[in-house]
């Protein structure tokens, strides 16, 4: 890619995204990620609500509208061939995610954490310092706003 960039004088933005979520996400429980899975399951009135793994597993979730904003900023103002992490830069525990979804869906089931099930890397949050300092990026949405908008979108399908 770098060679092509030099040959054609093409500006190439390199983006390393975190865990995006939002409207038009994949909500198929067999193949989707944790955010749409929790939204869909909460809306199906599961009670008790069994969640695999630990509530302490932490991820850098990012609402898709902010992800797009970050990607466009890299393309418009970023240095060609320089990688930028596009994320929120903030860790959200799976337990916090669950309670944000419960709040957005207005559900209150009994929660059971099943620690015997597989889990993943305990902490995965990207530094977005370069994106903030060099390109002036700031997310427009809070995590909770993104969850609420995504939930409302899914409910209105």
Q: In which residue ranges do the predicted regions lie?
A:
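C-terminal "lid/loop" region of Rossmann-like NAD(P)-dependent oxidoreductases
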Residues: 54, 81-84, 92-99, 106-123, ...
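Amphipathic terminal alpha-helices
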Residues: 143-157
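Non-catalytic, hydrophobic alpha-helical segments
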Residues: 67, 71, 86, 97, ...
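N-terminal Rossmann-like NAD(P)+-binding domain of SDR-like oxidoreductases, especially those catalyzing
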Residues: 1-26, 65, 141, 156-157
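Residue-level signal for the nucleotide or nucleotide-sugar donor/cofactor binding architecture
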Residues: 29-33, 59-65, 92, 119, ...
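Glycine/proline-rich active-site loop of Rossmann-fold NAD(P)-dependent oxidoreductases
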Residues: 8, 20-36, 45-48, 64-68, ...
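Generic alpha-helical structural context detector
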Residues: 36, 40-44, 69-73, 99, ...
């Amino acid at each position: 890619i770098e060679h092509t960039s030099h040959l054609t004088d093409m500006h190439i933005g390199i983006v390393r995204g975190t865990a995006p979520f939002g409207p038009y996400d994949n909500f198929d429980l067999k193949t989707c990620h944790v955010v749409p899975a929790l939204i869909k399951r909460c809306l199906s009135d599961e009670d008790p609500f069994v969640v695999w793994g630990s509530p302490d597993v932490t991820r850098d979730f990012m609402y898709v509208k902010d992800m797009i904003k970050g990607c466009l900023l890299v393309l418009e103002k970023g240095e060609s061939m320089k990688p930028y992490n596009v994320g929120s830069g903030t860790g959200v525990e799976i337990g916090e995610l669950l309670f944000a979804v419960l709040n957005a869906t207005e559900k209150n089931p009994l929660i059971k954490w099943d620690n015997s099930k597989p889990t993943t890397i305990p902490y995965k949050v990207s530094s977005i310092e370069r994106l903030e300092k060099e390109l002036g990026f700031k997310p427009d949405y809070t995590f909770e706003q993104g969850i609420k908008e995504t939930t409302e979108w899914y409910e209105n399908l």
